[in-house]
Structures are given as structure tokens and as C-alpha cells.
Amino acid sequence: MKSIRLIIISGLSGSGKSVALHTLEDQGWYCIDNLPIGLLSAFARHVNDTCPAGGGRYAVGIDARNRPEDLDRIPAILDELQALGLNSEVLFLFASRETLITRFSETRRRHPLSDGDAALADAIAREEALLAPLRARADLTLDTSNTNVHQLRDLVRERIEHDPGRLSLLFQSFGYKHGIPPDADYVFDARCLPNPHWEPRLRPLTGLDAPVQHYLEAQPEVAELTGQIEALIATWLPAFRKAARSYVTVAIGCTGGQHRSVYLAEQLAGRFATGMDAISVRHRELNR
């Protein structure tokens, strides 16, 4: 049986779609950018009919410049791909409006949906509405608001470059003062734990540093919360696999995203690393 993997990459302009597509191309994927939605089914059938016996990996970029009626057909087209027996997935990238406006201002590029005197914010809002059907069917969404080009490349490789039979499990730390990650499946609050920030010698360090780790290891409630989160995730991962979910993102937050959440994310990733899943860790605020 052929092992064919087809990923549809879409998202808001300025969020990193081209970076994601080029990253997969560098990894040996056959990539097509800006494919009209009306040709997606025909391309999938062609791949299914002509792909070598050993299978292949294909990525297709789709954006909002398609006709609105074609974008509305996305759910039906994705169902058709599943009926063909293809291992198809949708990756959707997005960023906050403020971030997108800043990126377009810095690059001085024109938004693809800008027409005449329309404000950039209006073009972004229109694009969000047009791509809503595709985002609703996404297997994986990535918020790139706080991610640079190099970090996005690493993130795409970590989340996509794995055996399709394995679940990609990401543990992400964050700071509540900077907002909850909108792409998380689970969110856990670690602000109830003792805060190393109030120890002057630990304040400039992070949860990756041994002194902070030793401080948190000595707190019984830290071990208790870590164990409870581990038990909950371990209990429900089989249900995600049964539902054919390929990606799960677990976010752990503290006030600033420097100490407690970083430590817990590392601890949880280590506890699940010996299993069958593809494990990755990301510390959002440490990348700022």
C-alpha cells in the first residue's frame, strides 16, 4: 500500500506560509504554491494514481486569492481527499492583527487583498473571514506572532517531520502577561506554585537553569501539579489517537513565562519522551 502524505498549507498573509512551504521543500517534499482550490482534487487524484509504490510527500499552498465560492467548498474537497484514502492534513498559520500590520509596514509589501484605499486592517479582517472554513478544518494551527523566521522553520520541522503514524505532542511554556496561546489544545495554570522570581538570586535565571530547577524540585506542590497534568494527558492521549488526531499542543503558563512554566514544560516533555509520540518543547517567552 502506498504511503502518501499530503499537507495543505494555508493561513493569513504575513504569517509565514511561504516559510513553512520552503522549509518542507528543503526537507524533500514536493511543493506547489498558490494552487487554485478548484485544482486540488485533480492534483490529489494525480498523486494517488502516479505516486511511486514507496509513496511520497506533497505540500500545497492555498491562500485567500481563490474565489469565495471555492473557499466555501473546502470542507467537501477535504472529505473527497479522505475518500481517496490519502493521508491529508491542513496546516494553518496565523498571527495577531497587530503583528501582521507591523510586518507589512516593515517590509512595505502590499497585502494581496488590498484594493485601492482599503485599510490594511480591513484587508486582514476580510482575509480572516474568507479563510475561516479552511481554518475550521485545520489539523494543526500555528500562532507565529512571537516567532521569527528561524524559529518558524524549526517549529515546522518539529511538528511536521515525523512518522504520520505517530502523534506530535508539543509542550509549550508561556507567560499570562503576554496572553494565552490561541493554538493550544490544553492550557494549565502554574501561577499557583511558589515563584522563583521573588528569590533575588533566581530572578535573572530561567526554568532551564539548575538553581531554579533545584528550587522548584524542593516544593511538594510542584511535583504534585506536574504529576496530575501528566496523568490527565496520559489518560486522554489514546482518545486523540483513536480520533486520528495528529497534533496536540499542551500549554503551561505562569506570570512571565520564565521560571515555573518553563520547568514544568521540560519535565512533562521528559516524562513522555520514552513513549511512541513525537515530543517537542517550545518556550514562547524565552524566544522574545
Curated annotation (Swiss-Prot):
<keyword id="KW-0067">ATP-binding</keyword>
<dbReference type="InterPro" id="IPR005337">
    <property type="entry name" value="RapZ-like"/>
</dbReference>
<keyword id="KW-0342">GTP-binding</keyword>
<feature type="binding site">
    <location>
        <begin position="11"/>
        <end position="18"/>
    </location>
    <ligand>
        <name>ATP</name>
    </ligand>
</feature>
<dbReference type="Pfam" id="PF03668">
    <property type="entry name" value="RapZ-like_N"/>
</dbReference>
<dbReference type="InterPro" id="IPR053930">
    <property type="entry name" value="RapZ-like_N"/>
</dbReference>
<dbReference type="Pfam" id="PF22740">
    <property type="entry name" value="PapZ_C"/>
</dbReference>
<dbReference type="InterPro" id="IPR027417">
    <property type="entry name" value="P-loop_NTPase"/>
</dbReference>
<dbReference type="GO" id="GO:0005525">
    <property type="term" value="F:GTP binding"/>
</dbReference>
<keyword id="KW-0547">Nucleotide-binding</keyword>
<protein>
    <recommendedName>
        <fullName>Nucleotide-binding protein Mlg_2233</fullName>
    </recommendedName>
</protein>
<dbReference type="GO" id="GO:0005524">
    <property type="term" value="F:ATP binding"/>
</dbReference>
<feature type="binding site">
    <location>
        <begin position="63"/>
        <end position="66"/>
    </location>
    <ligand>
        <name>GTP</name>
    </ligand>
</feature>
<dbReference type="InterPro" id="IPR053931">
    <property type="entry name" value="RapZ_C"/>
</dbReference>
<comment type="similarity">
    <text>Belongs to the RapZ-like family.</text>
</comment>
<comment type="function">
    <text>Displays ATPase and GTPase activities.</text>
</comment>
